[in-house]
Amino acid sequence: METTKKLSPIFCFSSLLCLFFTMNQAVSETDHMDTFCIDSSRNTTGNTTYNKNLNTMLSTFRNQSSIVNNYNLTTGLASDTVYGMFLCTGDVNITTCNNCVKNATIEIVKNCTNHREAIIYYIDCMVRYSDKFFLSTFEKKPNSIWSGDDPIPKSLGPFKKRLYKKMGEAIVRSSTLSSALTPYYYLDVTRFDGSYDLDSLVQCSPHLNPENCTICLEYALQEIIDCCSDKFWAMIFTPNCFVNYMITTSPLPPLPSPYHHSGSCSIRGNSEIFWGMIILAALVFTF
């Protein structure tokens, strides 16, 4: 005779909470993508005025990121002038932005000691500084590209063509948002074939004009199309813009293992994990 045991709701809920916080911590602790320390004959050594100005700037970024999701600053004079900026992705709240910028400003100094130019990419933000003015200049490099390992299902048909079309539409829309609260940020969710969603995000640095924003996003999209358009998700960060997409299923796709094209990164997983816990909880409590 078989006996069916039912878990108590309290035990189930406690287990789900433990699983959620464990997975959430794993994601949040590994969201650094890439750091680029630009080598130059202008690099400094020791406790210079330039380094002091840089530290002042990064401290200001940590404070300002608790208020706004993008900011730029110039500190110092003549050869000791530092130009810098931070930019958070438009889909994160101000707390997440602040945490990301705090981590980025600490890591960029730790990894790029005495460099007069550097850029660091996190999933939720980027921080950059230089001894040269760069804010309105369109630049393709250095960039960081990531994708999942899992291939998209054949049932989606000619996905590359469909992806190019939908992302192209998002880019056109983004270029009209230069005066938005989060300039040039656009997020789109499109249902494919009943059970698949295409989530696409595009965003430019607010200092670009609309023409250069479009050029940057089109370049970034082409990079993703060339390397990763057969994958469940992919993202690219450049000095001036971000592009990423993710295919999701109902209720959830398997969490993809990351494949890196130029650095180190993890998956943005908080929302997927959260909804996964909700769905699992609903199933458990029906028993």
Swiss-Prot record:
The record's InterPro entries line, in alphabetical order, gives: GNK2, GNK2_sf
**Lineage, highest ranks first:** Eukaryota, Viridiplantae, Streptophyta, Embryophyta, Tracheophyta
Q: Which UniProt keywords apply?
A: Glycoprotein, Repeat, Secreted, Signal
Identify the Pfam families for this entry.
Stress-antifung
| Compartments in which it is found | Secreted
Q: What is this protein called?
A: Cysteine-rich repeat secretory protein 59
Concerning CDD domains, the annotation shows: Gnk2-like
**UniProt keyword annotation of Repeat present:** yes
Q: What species is this protein from? A: Arabidopsis thaliana (Mouse-ear cress)
Superkingdom: Eukaryota
Instruction: Show the GO cellular component annotation of the record.
Output: extracellular region
Gene3D superfamilies attached to this UniProt entry: Gnk2 domain, C-X8-C-X2-C motif
Q: Where this protein primarily resides, as one coarse class? A: secreted
For this UniProt entry, which residues form the secretion signal? 1-26
Domain (Gnk2-homologous): give its ranges: 32-134, 140-250
Similarity comment: Belongs to the cysteine-rich repeat secretory protein family.
